[in-house]
């Protein structure tokens, strides 16, 4: 069945919203899928999994191995909702095993690492953490035909003309020579299909990650074990800091990927190389022609601002604290928001701790004008 993107609201899981997604957030939806507790985190939080489908082709999917990367978790539940309510025939060809939050401690604390401050995506060989050992155990037992590794990427990623990288993909290397092994070609072929489909929706906003080999990364390890593995990265769109727009596009990408595998819609793997590689030329805000105090006078300069993500445990929401990132000509840098301060008469003393607050006050004024 062809995906009708206008139907998104019909299968979107509206209970999930924002950036702070934990076991508690997903529990109501999860409970409808007959989940089981596959293991426990360092702090003994349950790591849930569920399965659906009776097809011979097995796909293992995990999300939030980095606890603060939650967009793909929302998209994953939207995708499952689509399959079960709109296109259940897919499950005759495939079977899904899903771990929606592999790192529940990191999700709770809104940290990349687990409770022991270990990056689970650098623990694929040593397997020092219970979460890593669980994923490997499920992989070894299931022997999947495909693996989907779901992540979020920072707002810095860009493509040509400073366009935002809203989606990124990677077929991980399986060796230092980046050889096109059979498993790697298969994952490239799936990505090529998704790229062709998604380029009709967000042309110019899809990127490809660097494929330098690191056996400590889970995707590289599974690819080296001859399992086609795909990295999905949820990127940023304009001022959508809750990542609800990106969520939708990741959902579509997951659906296209599963349809590709179920219906054998694989494209020429060489098309994978047509996806532009990600650059890191974006910031959250770029301000040009800002007057900065310099001794007894001032100078005109440019600066960039990045938001630091902070968990407010009272409201259980993520707050975005602005911080000055760079100052200078910054010709090779842009922003998701670019503002010209030439009409702002204020001279900003960047040595004062409240200078960023004054800058943001004027940012908001200019945004209201425009």
Residues of each region from the PLM?
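Active-site/substrate-binding loop(s) of hydrolase catalytic cores
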Residues: 56-60, 70-204
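N- or domain-start disorder-to-order transition segments that initiate the globular core
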Residues: 25-42
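C-terminal accessory segments enriched in acidic
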Residues: 1-24, 142, 170-370
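Active-site beta-strand termini and strand-to-loop segments that position acidic
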Residues: 50-54, 225
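N-terminal capping/interface segment
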Residues: 1-28, 77-94, 123
């Amino acid at each position: 069945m062809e995906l009708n993107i206008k139907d998104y609201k019909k299968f979107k899981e509206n209970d999930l919203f924002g950036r702070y997604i934990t076991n508690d957030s997903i529990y109501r939806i999860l409970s409808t899928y007959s989940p089981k507790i596959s293991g426990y985190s360092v702090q003994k939080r349950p790591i849930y999994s569920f399965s659906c489908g009776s097809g011979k082709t097995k796909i293992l999917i995990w999300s939030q191995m980095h606890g603060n990367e939650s967009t793909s978790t929302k998209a994953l539940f939207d995708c499952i909702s689509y399959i079960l309510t709109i296109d259940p025939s897919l499950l005759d060809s495939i079977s899904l095993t899903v771990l929606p939050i592999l790192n529940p401690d990191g999700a709770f604390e809104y940290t990349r690492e687990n409770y022991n401050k270990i990056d689970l995506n650098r623990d694929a060989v040593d397997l020092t953490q219970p979460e890593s050992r669980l994923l490997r155990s499920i992989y070894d037992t299931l022997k999947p035909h495909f693996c989907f590794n779901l992540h979020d990427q920072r707002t810095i990623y860009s493509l040509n003309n400073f366009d935002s990288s809203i989606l990124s993909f990677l077929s991980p290397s399986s060796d230092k020579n980046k050889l096109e092994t059979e498993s790697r070609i298969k994952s490239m072929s799936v990505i090529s299909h998704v790229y062709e489909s998604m380029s009709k929706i967000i042309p110019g906003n899809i990127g490809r990650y660097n494929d330098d080999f690191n056996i400590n990364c889970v995707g590289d390890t599974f690819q080296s074990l001859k399992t086609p593995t795909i990295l999905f990265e949820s990127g940023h769109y304009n001022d959508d800091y809750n990542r609800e727009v990106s969520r939708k596009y990741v959902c579509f990408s997951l659906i296209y990927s599963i349809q590709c595998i179920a219906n054998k819609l694989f494209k020429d793997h060489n098309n994978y190389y047509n996806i532009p590689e990600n650059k890191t030329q974006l910031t959250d805000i770029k301000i040009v022609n800002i007057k900065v105090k310099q001794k007894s006078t001032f100078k005109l300069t440019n600066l960039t601002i990045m938001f630091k993500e902070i968990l407010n445990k009272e409201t259980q929401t993520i707050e975005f604290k602005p911080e000055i990132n760079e100052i200078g000509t910054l010709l090779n840098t842009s922003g998701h928001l670019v503002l010209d301060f030439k009409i702002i008469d204020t001279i900003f003393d960047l040595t004062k701790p409240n200078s960023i607050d004054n800058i943001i006050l004027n940012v908001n004024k200019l945004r209201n004008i425009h």
